[in-house]
Amino acid sequence: MALLTAKRPKKEAAPATDTSNNESDSEDSQNVDGDTGANAGWADCIGKVLKSKSVGPTVLSRAKKNPAVVRSKTSEAAKKPGFDFEVVGGDVKEEDDDDEEDGDADKSALDATLTKTERRNVPLQLRVKPSYQDLERERTLRKVATRGVVQFFNAVRIQQKDLEQQLADAGPLDSRQDAVLNNINKRKFLDVLMSGKRAKSTAIDNAVKKEEQETDDDDEDDTAEASSTGKKKSEWNVLREDFMTNKKIKHWDEEDDEGSDQGANNDEADDSDDDDEED
């Protein structure tokens, strides 16, 4: 019985705890309602402050008609820096893009007419593929080039040996060595070059064009040589070896002296005639 009496007060105290819980729940709900109301008002204020005036993505077909888009483009154009100079006395020409458009249209039309393989071979049109028929000609040209190089170096070696031998025979005197060095002639080297065992010309199917003959009326010797050889004179006359020994240049000062002497004699004769008349 004592146990039952001890348990009964606990059962009677249970409704008191339920009422306290209900009161706490009601207070919490009121606090939550107050917090949500305050948060909602704060969210509205922040949304109004942070609300952007820029429009979202628009359809491209309607972008030109949208006043907001037009306004943004005009503002961007106004922000671009301008030029601080003026054109005086001239007209400013505006560049036309018609030529570029025409070129693009031509290229597109050409690409449309060509097939895939032809379009791939367009950059290779300037290339020339070697033919098997030209192998003999190429081989002949290689032989000629090799023979010419070998012959040239042999001629240089022979010329150097001859020069060393002549300097050794001349002795230690500088005057004799200078005389030997002055006797070096280009024609001798060419004679040595063309007098070798392999000094022969081979005919190739690709003939060289003949140069036309040019004659000079001022120099008779030049015309005679040109008519005999039939080659074009591409050398300056001053650089020729016989320039100073030419007949016309050899006595150029004597002709002037003779002319001046004749003029002086004529003047003296005129003066003497005048004196005789006065007497």
UniProtKB/Swiss-Prot annotation:
One Gene Ontology cellular component annotation held by this UniProt entry: preribosome, large subunit precursor
Top-level division of the source organism's lineage: Eukaryota
Region (Disordered): 1-40, 56-120, 200-279
InterPro entries for this protein: Rrp15
Biased composition (Basic and acidic residues): 73-83, 232-245
Pfam hit, one: Rrp15p
Residue ranges of coiled coil: none
Gene Ontology biological-process annotations: maturation of 5.8S rRNA; maturation of LSU-rRNA
Compositional bias ranges of the Acidic residues kind: 93-104, 213-224, 267-279
Family, as annotated: Belongs to the RRP15 family.
Protein name: RRP15-like protein
